[in-house]
């Protein structure tokens, strides 16, 4: 077992055996989360159809990278966070994914309206701290919309600049979003 806490970032490249454990909320950021998952065990959980979710021990065992020991995981995959910017208004952290992944992730902490740029990629974001925020277009290309804690939202690349503002019960409080983009 590897202890984790809220906002830890765990990199899980293909072939790494893992499970979330009890009482954990997991935000999985992946290009193919269900296509290539080989479940070795699923704790008796059922799918939307009410039937046990499939496990595939034989195929899964062929996918395991057996050199990924507990020590290797602790040294290489746990919370490799780098602070890119830290001002009174904004903290930006590169949380990254494993170097083999083509997705880049950054976490943003702020307590007032903050401008973002799509950086020539579709943006997938999730509100990971705070109760709600409003997403607005700088140029009016879309109607403002409110997102709530743990909700995921997408901003198309063609939008360019957009703003995120804490609102409602999060107004004037620090919130955080994690943003995933395709590395260019």
Segments predicted by a language model, with ranges:
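Ligand-binding loop in jelly-roll beta-barrel domains
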Residues: 16-35, 144, 148, 156-184
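Contiguous mid-protein beta-loop-alpha structural module that forms a pocket-lining wall or clamp
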Residues: 1-55, 60
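A generic structural signal for well-ordered coil/turn residues at beta-strand boundaries
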Residues: 6, 102-104, 121, 149
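Conserved hydrophobic/aromatic beta-strand scaffold that supports enzyme active sites
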Residues: 9, 17, 26, 105-107, ...
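C-terminal amphipathic alpha-helical segment
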Residues: 37-119
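Glycine- and acidic-residue-biased ligand/ion/polar-headgroup-sensing regions
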Residues: 23, 110-142, 148-150
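Short acidic-glycine-tyrosine-enriched beta hairpin
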Residues: 2-11, 135-159
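Intrinsically disordered, low-complexity coil segments
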Residues: 48-55, 97, 136-143, 167-174
């Amino acid at each position: 077992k590897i202890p984790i806490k809220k906002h830890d970032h765990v990199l899980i490249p293909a072939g790494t055996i893992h499970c979330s454990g009890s009482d954990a909320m997991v935000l999985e950021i992946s290009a193919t989360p269900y296509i290539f998952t080989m479940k070795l065990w699923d704790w008796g959980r059922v799918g939307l159809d009410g039937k046990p979710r499939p496990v595939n021990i034989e195929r899964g065992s062929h996918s395991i990278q057996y050199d990924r020991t507990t020590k290797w995981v602790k040294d290489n995959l746990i919370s490799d966070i780098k602070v890119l910017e830290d001002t009174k208004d904004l903290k930006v952290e590169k949380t990254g994914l494993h170097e083999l992944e083509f997705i880049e992730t950054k976490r943003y902490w702020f307590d007032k309206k903050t401008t973002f740029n799509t950086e020539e990629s579709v943006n997938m974001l999730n509100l990971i701290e705070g109760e709600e925020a409003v997403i607005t277009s700088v140029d009016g290309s879309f109607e403002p919309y409110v997102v709530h804690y743990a909700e995921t939202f997408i901003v198309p690349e063609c939008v360019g600049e957009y703003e995120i503002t804490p609102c409602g019960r999060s107004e004037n409080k620090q919130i955080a979003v994690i943003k995933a983009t395709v590395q260019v």
